[in-house]
Structures are given as structure tokens and as C-alpha cells.
Design a protein with these regions (language model features):
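Active-site beta->alpha loop and helix N-cap motifs at the rims of alpha/beta catalytic domains
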Residues: 1-7, 12-142
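C-terminal alpha-helical cap/extension of soluble enzyme domains
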Residues: 6-12, 34-36, 45, 196-199, ...
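Short, amphipathic alpha-helical "lid/cap" segments that border enzyme active or binding sites
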Residues: 21, 25-28, 145, 278, ...
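A general structural signal for well-ordered alpha-helical segments in protein cores
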Residues: 24, 56, 60, 85, ...
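Alpha-helical structural signal in soluble globular domains
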Residues: 34, 58, 62-67, 91, ...
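Short secondary-structure transition/capping segments
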Residues: 51-54, 87, 112-115, 143-145, ...
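Catalytic alpha/beta core domains of metabolic enzymes, predominantly
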Residues: 124-125, 138-244
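Glycine-rich phosphate-binding "P-loop"
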Residues: 134, 156-157, 267
């Protein structure tokens, strides 16, 4: 179910910091129209930590409504309190989410056995698929290949979003888990080599800006057309990289605001990029022709 190009959706806010529901609906429709394979609301890129529980549920509800079964919805549900994650996961299942993306517990830094028991408990509480989200740079915890091999034996643990950036580790994971266990790149810039190693797709930040192009890149990879994929990668790699010039989702929301897709609003402790980085973002957008393209489409 969760293969190909999944978009880690941003969460748009109004200037009064409230959730901008009309903008969110427009962004979701834009993704579906562009041909992405699944949607991922309320992850890191969706500023999940600064959403209230009610807002979290509302964002997922809107995503389910707007997707209308056209693409699966993989909703964020992670944390360092297993019991609370279970309750959130149950609520998301009730709302119609097709699966959950669950980041590893952070701050309390569980052992590998603790990680296994954490995900096993979540899996026992819900019937929809779980994608493990391993991002050591943010959580301080790495899900080791041996742990993922164990987790893959649990029926509804369906895959991993692997954001270690460690190609050797990803190769080991692919070699040890069943073929149907989705190994998804958590980094746009290395999605191509991850799929070449046997991975199944990406959970993408850059697809917020270029959904059709990123969907095409991933589809080319999955079809083995790496010459085409490399050309797309060459064109859009600067955008993939500039999205992380500061903490995500600061740069991507800045770019989307420049493209006329949303208001440039974050919730503290996130702040707008520095002026010099804003100019770099604008330069990349102009170099690949995105600003005028989207503004023109928005006015037609």
C-alpha cells in the first residue's frame, strides 16, 4: 500500500496561527492531481509537535476527506509514551487513516528491545498498517536492521521510513526484511539509490513543491529507468538540498509561500529562515522556474 512517492504534507497556518483549513484542502487536492501515491499528514514536516491533539485529528480528518479514497493516508502518530501513542493511533484509525507513521520514542532513548516492545504494543492495539519512522538525527535513537527484521514478522508492521542517511545500513535492511516490507527513503536526495538497492519509494518533503516531478522521478526508479530518474534528480537536487538549509519545515514552507501556495507562518519554536537563506531559496526557485509557474497557475 505504501510504495512510490508519499508526500510529507506541510500544515498551513493563518497569520493568527490558527489552522488554515481551506489552504490545507487546496494543497491536498494539488498533490492528488499531481499523481503522488500516498499522503502523510502530521509528521515532522507537518509541524506535528506544535499541533494540539484536536488539531492533529482535524488535519488527518481533512486529509482523509479530501483524498476520498483516491490515495492512501499514512497519518503521523509517534511519541515517547507508548500508551499515549496507542490512544492516538486508535483515534486515527477511527477517522479513516489507512496506516500510521510512528516515529521512534525520543528523549527517553529506549534500547532495541524497548523499541521492539513499543511497536509490538501499538501493532496489537490497531488493525491498520504501521510504518516505523527511524530518524536518529532527531530522536537520538537508531532502529537497527536486526530490530527491523524482528518487527517485520509482526503482521501489521508494514515498513520503515529510513532517515539515517546511512546507505550501508539501508542496504542491510533491504537484504534482511521480506520483499513486501516497504523500505522508504526519508531523504529526497538519496531516494534514487535507496530504490536501486531494493527500496520501495520515498516519504518526500520536496513533493510539497514539485509533486508531479517527484512522483515521476520515483516512478522512473521503480520501473528501472534510472537514466530518466538521474536527469530529474540533477534538475531538482538543489531544491531538495535547500529545503534543509535550516530546520525542516522552515525552508519548504518559505518556498511554498514564494510560490503562492500558503502563508509564510510557523509556530514557535520554529521561526522564518534568515534573510541570507531566504535569498538562497528564492534563487533556487527562480533557477528552476517555479515561482512564475505556480503564480500563473494560481491566477488562471
Amino acid at each position: 500500500m505504501f510504495t512510490g512517492c508519499g508526500t510529507a504534507l506541510v500544515t498551513p497556518f493563518r497569520h493568527d496561527l490558527s489552522l488554515d483549513e481551506p489552504a490545507l484542502r487546496r494543497l491536498i487536492r494539488r498533490q492528488i492531481d499531481a499523481g503522488v501515491d500516498f499522503l502523510v499528514p502530521c509528521g515532522t514536516t507537518g509541524e506535528n509537535p506544535t499541533l494540539t491533539r484536536a488539531e492533529h485529528l482535524r488535519v488527518v480528518q481533512i486529509t482523509v476527506e479530501e483524498s476520498s479514497g483516491q490515495v492512501p493516508v499514512l497519518a503521523g502518530a509517534g511519541g515517547y509514551n507508548t500508551a499515549e501513542v496507542i490512544e492516538l493511533a486508535k483515534d486515527l484509525e477511527s477517522l479513516g487513516a489507512d496506516g500510521i507513521l510512528s516515529v521512534t520514542p525520543y528523549y527517553n532513548k529506549p534500547t532495541q528491545e524497548g523499541l521492539y516492545q513499543h511497536y509490538k504494543a501499538i501493532a496489537a492495539a490497531i488493525s491498520i498498517p504501521i510504518i516505523v519512522y527511524s530518524v536518529q538525527s532527531r530522536t537520538g535513537v537508531n532502529v537497527e536492521p536486526a530490530t527491523l527484521k524482528r518487527l517485520a514478522q509482526i503482521e501489521n508492521i508494514a515498513g520503515v521510513k529510513e532517515a539515517s542517511g546511512n546507505i550501508g545500513q539501508i542496504a542491510t535492511i533491504v537484504s534482511q526484511v521480506p520483499e513486501q516490507f516497504s523500505v522508504l527513503s526519508g531523504d529526497d536526495a538519496i531516494a534514487l539509490p535507496v530504490i536501486a538497492l531494493g527500496g520501495h519509494g520515498v516519504i518526500s518533503v520536496v513533493a510539497n513543491e514539485i509533486p508531479a516531478e517527484m512522483a515521476s522521478l520515483i516512478q522512473a526508479c521503480l520501473e528501472g529507468n534510472f537514466a530518466c530518474a538521474r536527469e530529474l534528480q540533477k534538475t531538482y537536487l538543489p531544491l531538495m538540498e535547500i529545503n534543509f538549509i535550516e530546520s525542516n519545515p522552515g525552508p519548504v514552507k518559505t518556498a511554498m509561500a514564494e510560490m503562492g501556495l500558503l502563508e509564510p507562518v510557523w509556530r514557535l519554536p520554529l521561526v522564518p529562515p534568515k534573510i541570507e537563506n531566504l535569498e538562497k531559496i528564492r534563487g533556487i526557485l527562480e533557477s528552476i522556474g517555479l515561482v512564475g509557474k505556480v503564480h500563473a497557475a494560481a491566477t488562471n
